Amino acid sequence: LESGMLQLKLDWCDLEDVVSGALRRSKEHTQSYKIKVEIADDLPLIYADAALLEHVVLNLLDNAVKYSVEGSEIEIQTCLDDSEVIVMVKDLGLGVTAKDLPHLFDKFYRARQTEKISGTGLGLAICKGIVDAHRGRIWAKQRTGGGSIFAFALPVTLPEEKAGEKND
């Protein structure tokens, strides 16, 4: 990722399939949580690396589980907003302090309140690298009423070299 040499295996993919794949892979860890999934009906196919996006969703979901009370609700939502598709993972866990928010996607950064929870501090940095490679953006924010929201957005517009192929 750091060298900028990440090779994306781009193809048309459905975000519903990406989310479903992440849910299947996390089933063992999420079975004691109430997982709520809302996939927007109007999502277009996107030109992306589905396996890497599944890794991003899986990491965000695993973090939600790691920082939430067993049995609590975790939501995964997708939506279309102008020229972006957005995937959000919402939890009712520990939440994120305003002080930690700007650093969450830095390599090796661990929020203070999470010192007793295992992790390397690389997961969110890797997610950021994957999303950046797709010309997207990733962020986190505090959730009203407690917990946090981690989200990423990807453009639905085609890379210039693919625009002609779709019209053929």
Q: How does the language model describe each region?
A:
Residues 3-8, 45-48:
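Conserved micro-motifs of the catalytic ATP-binding
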Residues 96-108:
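Short conserved segment of the HATPase_c
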Residues 123, 127:
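Short alpha-helical Gxxx[C/S/T] motif in the catalytic ATP-binding
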Residues 64-65:
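Short helix-loop "hinge" at the ATP-lid/N-box region of the Bergerat-fold HATPase_c
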Residues 9-13, 34-44:
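Conserved catalytic submotifs in the C-terminal HATPase_c
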Residues 9-24:
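A conserved beta-strand-to-alpha-helix junction within the catalytic ATP-binding
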